[in-house]
């Protein structure tokens, strides 16, 4: 049947049904929620049931467990996560029925088409920076739409359709999909060697992709670049777009001065381009989070948010799920009282930043880390760096690698990593074969007063929550 489009206001009515394959993923669920709010009939499928799928179902989405060709019948468009294989039965059925298939990033680009887009890219810090930017713009009365790769705790969601003209979203470089976006502002937090498997194991191709990302800006667009990162600083010198820099360097346009850590908070002086200085107390620990806050402050300043309002947003920021998420204290079966922090960090540079934040905030505590490596390829590519940074903690428990769909790689598993750490002579790692057994092993390692960091991008976060809810007994459901 040929459908008639009378005007742009009829788009939802003309093509109302959108189906998401892999709807439970952080990037997918956020887009699905925005489209639900726009009035689309949203359905989706996922192999797992999680907080995101339950929230979407409560909001009115039709969510199916598992993948089946029948799930896409009657839909007008299929949105697919990059984690989904081409032979997925829903994709095969959509092709046979000639239903349009949109990659996740392409649908995000469609949403951005109807707003003024701010895209936050970088190997590390995207989620926190995007969340802080959304908080600053919200505090400034701009009511932005946001799509974030983690749960913004104040909103209880990772996405919201705002009434304002700005949309702020993460731009995912991991698979090159950020090159589908056409924002008005582009942030680059840092550039590091990660996801090399998607770039032919060639770091130069990652560098080139970020350069191309800035080329997606219109001639009147703005690049917001962290010049404390050497790779980003090099890019700033050769990008043919307007550039505004941020960082702790003296030549940064937006910079932090007199930075000190006060427990779980950071205090600094925010210096803006016209010379205005404002004291800031950031409700997040670590110098890396100061840089994330500077990017958000630069965005706010560009859009006319007052310095005092920026500072208030940063001080009142409630945090993001699994980004140095202080879950509180719990008592082990041996009577030790420990503080548990859950964090998504899974790259050596992220681990180093989180360890520094933990030691800066709790210098008198022993730092105990439970780490679940993420992907065999990353463990192989960053093996020496992982061994170096993990050997700096007071006690370490390693679970087996979370494969994320990868086949095992010889010499890139947790036992090999433990041997490399042990050879450095600074710690004696404990290796747990199954992540479900982690909670029962930890009491043998923990002492009273310890700070326990639960880290990784896999399912270790469920173990952290299980420990808070049930103690160090049993296995996560």
Swiss-Prot record:
Its main location: cytoplasm. Gene3D superfamilies: Mur ligase, C-terminal domain, Mur-like, catalytic domain, NAD(P)-binding Rossmann-like Domain. One of its GO terms (cellular component) is cytoplasm. It is found in: Cytoplasm. Belongs to the MurCDEF family. It is an enzyme of class 6 (ligase). ATP binds at residues 122-128. Its EC number is 6.3.2.8. It catalyses: UDP-N-acetyl-alpha-D-muramate + L-alanine + ATP = UDP-N-acetyl-alpha-D-muramoyl-L-alanine + ADP + phosphate + H(+). This is UDP-N-acetylmuramate--L-alanine ligase. GO terms for biological process: cell division; cell wall organization; peptidoglycan biosynthetic process; regulation of cell shape. GO terms for molecular function: ATP binding; UDP-N-acetylmuramate-L-alanine ligase activity. Keywords: ATP-binding, Cell cycle, Cell division, Cell shape, Cell wall biogenesis/degradation, Cytoplasm, Ligase, Nucleotide-binding, Peptidoglycan synthesis. Cell wall formation. Pathway: Cell wall biogenesis; peptidoglycan biosynthesis.
């Amino acid at each position: 049947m040929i459908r008639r489009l009378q005007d742009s206001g009829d788009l939802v009515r003309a093509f109302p049904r959108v189906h998401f394959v892999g709807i439970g993923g952080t990037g997918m669920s956020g887009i699905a929620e925005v489209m639900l709010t726009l009035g689309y009939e949203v359905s989706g499928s996922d192999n797992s049931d999680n907080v995101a799928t339950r929230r979407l179902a409560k909001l009115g989405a039709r969510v199916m467990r598992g993948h089946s060709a029948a799930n896409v019948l009657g839909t007008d468009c299929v949105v697919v996560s990059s984690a989904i294989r081409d032979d997925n039965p829903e994709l095969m059925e959509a092709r046979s029925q000639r239903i349009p298939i949109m990659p996740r990033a392409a649908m995000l680009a469609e949403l951005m088409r109807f707003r003024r887009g701010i895209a936050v890219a970088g190997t590390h810090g995207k989620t926190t920076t995007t969340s802080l930017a959304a908080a600053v713009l919200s505090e400034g009365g701009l009511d932005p739409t946001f799509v974030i790769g983690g749960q913004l705790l104040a909103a209880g969601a990772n996405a919201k359709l705002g009434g304002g003209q700005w949309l702020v979203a993460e731009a995912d470089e991991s698979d090159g999909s950020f090159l589908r976006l056409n924002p008005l502002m582009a942030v680059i937090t840092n550039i590091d060697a990660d996801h090399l498997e998607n770039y032919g194991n060639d770091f130069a191709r990652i560098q080139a992709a970020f350069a191309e990302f800035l080329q997606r800006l219109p001639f009147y667009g703005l690049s917001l670049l962290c010049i404390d990162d050497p790779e980003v600083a090099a890019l700033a010198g050769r990008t043919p777009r307007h550039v505004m820099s941020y960082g702790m360097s003296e030549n940064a346009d937006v910079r932090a001065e007199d930075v000190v850590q006060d427990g779980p908070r950071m205090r600094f002086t925010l210096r803006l381009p016209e010379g205005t200085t404002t004291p800031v107390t950031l409700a997040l620990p670590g110098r890396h989070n100061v840089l994330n806050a500077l990017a958000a402050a630069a965005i706010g300043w560009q859009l006319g948010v007052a310095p005092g309002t920026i500072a208030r947003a940063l001080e009142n920021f409630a945090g993001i799920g699994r980004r140095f998420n202080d879950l509180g204290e719990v008592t082990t079966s041996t009577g030790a009282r420990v503080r548990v922090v859950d964090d998504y960090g899974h790259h050596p540079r992220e681990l180093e930043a989180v360890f520094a934040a933990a030691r800066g905030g709790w210098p008198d505590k022993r730092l105990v880390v439970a780490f679940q490596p993420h992907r065999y390829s990353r463990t192989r590519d960053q093996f020496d760096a992982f061994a170096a940074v993990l050997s700096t903690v007071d006690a370490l428990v390693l679970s087996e690698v979370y494969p994320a769909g990868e086949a095992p790689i010889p010499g890139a598993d947790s036992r090999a990593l433990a041997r490399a750490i042990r050879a450095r002579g600074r710690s004696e790692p404990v290796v747990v074969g199954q992540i479900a057994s982690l909670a029962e092993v930890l009491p043998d390692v923990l002492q009273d007063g310890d700070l326990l960091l639960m880290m990784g991008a896999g399912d270790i976060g469920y173990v952290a929550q299980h420990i808070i809810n049930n103690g160090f007994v049993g296995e996560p459901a």
